[in-house]
Amino acid sequence: MNVDYINMIREDITKYIQSNTLRVGAKQSLAIMPEGDIPQDLQIEVQPQAQLDLLALHTGSRSVRFCVSQAEDSRVSLFLLALGGDEVAQSVRVNLLGAHAECSIFGFSAASLSQKYSSDIVVNHAAAACSSVQLFRQVVSDSADVSFEGRVMVAQDAQRTDAQQSCKTLLLSDSARVHTLPHLEIYADDVKCSHGATVGQLSAEVLFYLRSRGVSLLRARQLLLLGFADEVVQKIPAKALRESITTLIAKKIAANA
């Protein structure tokens, strides 16, 4: 299915919504980066063979909740980026109700000062042969607090499920806090599921290598952090949008590296 990703630009999402519900009809495609506020509670219905790419960029305090229902052979990609605001809370519930549905959720957050960001993700595999990905990268500095809770539920009838989950966090200060809780709940036999969460610091060995090549310590830290964020940013399908998001992240990192 082809999507004109040039149209994944800032746009008023309200014209696609009725009664807080965004519907993508059968075999339709929609790629959008909403302009302005997203409804705090948004129901998303994706019908058979439909495709949705939705990017939510948070540069101010915000609380959002997405509830996604996917029919057979549908594909959804959600991009959740938290780069500003004292407090950002993101909640996503995905129900894969039809066979061969695919859902990918990519998240990046950079928290500093006393900012508090949270991501609460649940993907429910209710049908056979569905796949899901949760890929989150977090950078935490100063006295910021970031949490990630990701849950994958696989029903008894959801055979041939493929579910992957990964959350990695870099701590840049001793006072920064992170809470991660990946969780798998599996009732089927024929599945391929993995989950993992790591918390660490910038590699001293790589920093030393870069400095030995004449790169300043500050620039070396910035390069490593940009590479870390790029694991998520490169999943964004529109090149122009990737570049603008990278610029925003670089500004955030420059202030906190």
Model-identified regions with their sequence ranges:
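Short amphipathic alpha-helical leader/targeting segments
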Residues: Q115, R137, L224, Q234-K235
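Short glycine/proline-enriched turn or capping motifs at secondary-structure junctions
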Residues: Q222, P237-T246
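Conserved beta-strand/loop scaffold segments within soluble protein domains that form the structured core
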Residues: D4-F208, S212-V215, R242-A257
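Short arginine-rich
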Residues: F228-A238
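Extended amphipathic alpha-helical segments enriched in small hydrophobics
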Residues: Y209-G214, R219-D230
